[in-house]
């Protein structure tokens, strides 16, 4: 058995092509046939859903009580401002949480560079637009920045303390992952007389807070650590009874409208009685392609949006739908 393991090829050539400061193409070859997709898919999922980073998770704006407000002298409404805050690429050095201030008056654009920073806080995209002010406009806000991993909806951070939280502290859904886009292709590779080998090419783009090469290195480390337990696997003398968790991930109970799909894709899903994210992930690609007016472009959009939240099509949920999810809720969704 040991000799057959040693016959497996291991990658001998790694090439990193820097496309821009935030984008790189990493080529790994040669790989045994099939290992290109095995490694590429695993690394892609980790890069999209499991990379740690920092994001704005809460905003408190003077004169604003809720997100549906408008501010005099500010071109954008509060919802637009909150969406713009999500696009700030920020790094914390040595801290997991910090509160920052932004004060701006008079006509002009308000950008991420206007945020008052501590010495251990860094903003990569200082030219990122937050709002536009008129001559009589002013913007005074406090921003809470936290460290996290992957994607975290605002309601996942709710606790008993939130009930006593002052009115006007607006919670944001946070995308902590510094990875903005990742795709991979598997090409043919050749070693001597063997022509059926794989070459893995990963195209990776980040928000600038993490170098693409470092991102792929961290993803590989996470995968290695998760698989390490299998190397010295030993069976227990007595079977361990694992209690089944009835609790369902809250994100699966959210409506598909929260995925912010195009109108065409959203309407196609609703026509097939797919109202919740939990309904969607249980469908396969083949099933969705049979949906009238839903083509490959819409399917790709759906897969990318799910992947950004650590989900994919074709997943199985044993306890779906939960008892708390009533059928009449779907009728009014």
Swiss-Prot record:
What is one cellular component GO term in this UniProt entry? DNA-directed RNA polymerase complex
Q: What is its EC number?
A: 2.7.7.6
- What is its EC class? transferase
Gene3D superfamilies according to UniProt? 5' to 3' exonuclease, C-terminal subdomain, DNA-directed RNA polymerase, insert domain, RNA polymerase, RBP11-like subunit
Keywords of this entry: DNA-directed RNA polymerase, Nucleotidyltransferase, Transcription, Transferase
Per its UniProt record, what InterPro entries does this chain match?
A: DNA-dir_RNA_pol_insert, DNA-dir_RNA_pol_RpoA/D/Rpb3, DNA-dir_RpoA, RBP11-like, RNAP_asu_C, RNApol_insert_sf
Q: Does the keyword Transferase apply?
A: yes
Is Transcription found in the keyword set?
yes
Give one GO molecular function term.
Answer: protein dimerization activity
Region Alpha C-terminal domain (alpha-CTD): start-end pairs? 248-333
Q: Identify the Pfam families for this entry.
A: RNA_pol_A_bac (PF01000), RNA_pol_A_CTD (PF03118), RNA_pol_L (PF01193)
Q: Name one GO biological process term.
A: DNA-templated transcription
Catalysed reactions listed for this entry: RNA(n) + a ribonucleoside 5'-triphosphate = RNA(n+1) + diphosphate
Please give the residue ranges the record annotates as the region Alpha N-terminal domain (alpha-NTD): 1-234
Quaternary organization: Homodimer. The RNAP catalytic core consists of 2 alpha, 1 beta, 1 beta' and 1 omega subunit. When a sigma factor is associated with the core the holoenzyme is formed, which can initiate transcription.
Comment on protein domains: The N-terminal domain is essential for RNAP assembly and basal transcription, whereas the C-terminal domain is involved in interaction with transcriptional regulators and with upstream promoter elements.
Q: Function of this protein?
A: DNA-dependent RNA polymerase catalyzes the transcription of DNA into RNA using the four ribonucleoside triphosphates as substrates.
Q: Which family does it belong to?
A: Belongs to the RNA polymerase alpha chain family.
Protein name in the entry? DNA-directed RNA polymerase subunit alpha
């Amino acid at each position: 058995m040991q000799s057959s393991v040693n016959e497996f090829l291991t990658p001998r050539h790694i090439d990193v092509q820097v496309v821009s400061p935030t984008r790189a193409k990493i080529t790994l070859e040669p790989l045994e046939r099939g290992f290109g997709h095995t490694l590429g898919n695993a690394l892609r999922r980790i890069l999209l859903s499991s990379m740690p980073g920092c994001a704005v998770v809460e905003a408190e704006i003077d004169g604003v009580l809720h997100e549906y407000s408008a501010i005099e002298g500010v071109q954008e409404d509060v919802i637009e401002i909150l969406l713009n805050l999500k696009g700030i690429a920020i790094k914390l050095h040595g801290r997991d949480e910090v509160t920052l201030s932004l004060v701006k008056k008079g006509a002009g654009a308000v950008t991420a560079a206007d945020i008052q920073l501590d010495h251990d806080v860094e903003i990569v995209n200082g030219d990122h637009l937050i709002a536009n002010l008129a001559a009589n406009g002013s913007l005074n806000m406090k921003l809470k920045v936290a460290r996290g991993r992957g994607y975290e909806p605002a309601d996942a951070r709710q606790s008993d303390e939130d009930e006593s939280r002052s009115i006007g502290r607006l919670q944001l859904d946070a995308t902590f992952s510094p990875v903005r886009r990742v795709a991979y292709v598997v090409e043919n590779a050749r070693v001597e007389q063997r022509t059926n080998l794989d070459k893995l090419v990963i195209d990776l783009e980040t928000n600038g807070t993490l170098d693409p090469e470092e991102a792929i290195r961290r993803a590989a480390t996470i995968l290695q650590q998760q698989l390490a337990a299998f190397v010295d696997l030993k069976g227990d003398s007595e079977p361990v009874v694992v209690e089944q968790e009835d609790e369902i991930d809250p994100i699966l109970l959210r409506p598909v409208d929260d995925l912010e799909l195009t109108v065409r894709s959203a309407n196609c899903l609703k026509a097939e009685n797919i109202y919740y994210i939990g309904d969607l992930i249980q469908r396969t690609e083949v099933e969705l392609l049979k949906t009238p007016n839903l083509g490959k472009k819409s399917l790709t959009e759906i897969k990318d949006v799910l992947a950004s939240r650590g989900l994919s099509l074709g997943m199985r949920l044993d306890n779906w739908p939960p008892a708390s999810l009533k059928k009449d809720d779907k009728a009014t969704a």
